[in-house]
Amino acid sequence: MAAKDVVFGDSARAKMVEGVNILANAVKVTLGPKGRNVVLERSFGGPTVTKDGVSVAKEIELKDKLQNMGAQMVKEVASKTSDNAGDGTTTATVLAQSIVREGMKYVASGMNPMDLKRGIDKAVTAAIEELRKISKPCTTNKEIAQVGAISANSDSSIGDRIAEAMDKVGKEGVITVEDGKSLQDELDVVEGMQFDRGYLSPYFINNPDKQVAVLDNPFVLLHDKKVSNIRDLLPVLEQVAKAGRPLLIIAEDVEGEALATLVVNNIRGILKTVAVKAPGFGDRRKAMLEDIAILTGGQVIAEETGLTLEKATLAELGQAKRIEVGKENTTIIDGAGEAANIEARVKQVRTQIEEATSDYDREKLQERVAKLAGGVAVIKVGAATEVEMKEKKARVEDALHATRAAVEEGIVAGGGVALIRARTAIAGLKGANADQDAGIKIVLRAMEEPLRQIVTNGGEEASVVVAAVAAGQGNYGYNAATGEYVDLVDAGVVDPTKVTRTALQNAASVAGLLLTTDAAVCELPKEDAPMAGGMPGGMGGMGMDM
């Protein structure tokens, strides 16, 4: 095991604080509507230009081990805030830097770091309670668009696109962001349930222009095994033919004579059918088949449930208003399932989301909820160059997270004003001793910092603006984009409550850990061994006269 360097007390803390400041100073220039850009070097291709705090934080790695420890701890604040709320990373970094900077002064003067931390925690709890009180629900399209626009660095077109997408697919619907092919942003909406499996034979196509198979008012047969023998299918095919309606077969696979017979019947116009493979694999496939069954009001024909293909009846088949099957996707529109059953299924999947341990599982379960509850919207981001496309796409994703957070916990006045208003809950707060009181003061001072930074980035005098905003009430604040004092909620300058709350909580948590650090252990820099000496030059005696 390599030897380690152990550094104690102020020496350790001072170096770590240097790291905190390096990272925070690079991140905080991006805050607010007049935030500056940061250019990130790429090992290949052109550099990336961004105003996204977490993207800047992720790039920073410092040479000095102790400085790097401090920087990594604040990086954790940014990424945790991004994971939980999707936005507010720069605000969280600014808050963490302020709490660390103020706290270090008190620690250096001999105060007890543990009591300081208790005071900080007490103040943060009171501030969060106050934020919840002043929060208002975010319900209208206009409010959703405002949140999206602010999060996307005051780009109202992005806010409008997100509000439109949420309106189309509902609050629970899946909204994904992709690269567009034009200069304008576009919105594609897929209503109903879509899964990534297409027709098993191109002979099923009945709309040559769109290269899709369209089934109107079809039955849906769901089976969890392979179908290769047509005799298994005949009884149910005869019943469907009598009913005079088309049929969609979703099974693990349809092959051999079963597929050939379906194709021949389709070409001759005897029975309109389409066969597709079931989506997913393993247990996920079973779950998705069950989802489709509930959505269409049918049953999965599986041996586990005591049902067989030969004995299947029309009562066990699902139904839908319309189904479109393309080469790679199948879309079920307006399934005949009962709303109460669909709701119960959504609730069940949501419980699984809460219990999921991996991000991948959580993402897949959320997709299932969306497919059951609403639909899928795709925002295609348009830009002139690839560099602009990457930057804009990152902003759209941020804005999307922020709007979801706003719908979840409501909104507060933006521009750092909500934190100024939440200070009223702390102003009269008292700790158990003088050191805890100092901890409360640290948070009071830190909660001004986001507003100060927004104003500084806008090129104005921060102290004047902070004093003017603090003297006001409610949503009265400073709009840095226009340089005016207005009612920020009316002006559309709003932040999701969840973002502000998460930023404050995470900043206080990591800053508290830094303040209570008394030793740091890191690897000693490796000393490269000197290179081995070369061979002696020349070969004596060669070419000499004897």
Swiss-Prot record:
GO terms for biological process: protein refolding. Pfam families: Cpn60_TCP1. It is found in: Cytoplasm. Its EC number is 5.6.1.7. Gene3D superfamilies: GroEL (3.50.7.10), GroEL-like equatorial domain (1.10.560.10), TCP-1-like chaperonin intermediate domain (3.30.260.10). Keywords: ATP-binding, Chaperone, Cytoplasm, Isomerase, Nucleotide-binding. Its main location: cytoplasm. It comes from the Bacteria. Forms a cylinder of 14 subunits composed of two heptameric rings stacked back-to-back. Interacts with the co-chaperonin GroES. This is Chaperonin GroEL. It comes from Paraburkholderia phytofirmans (strain DSM 17436 / LMG 22146 / PsJN).
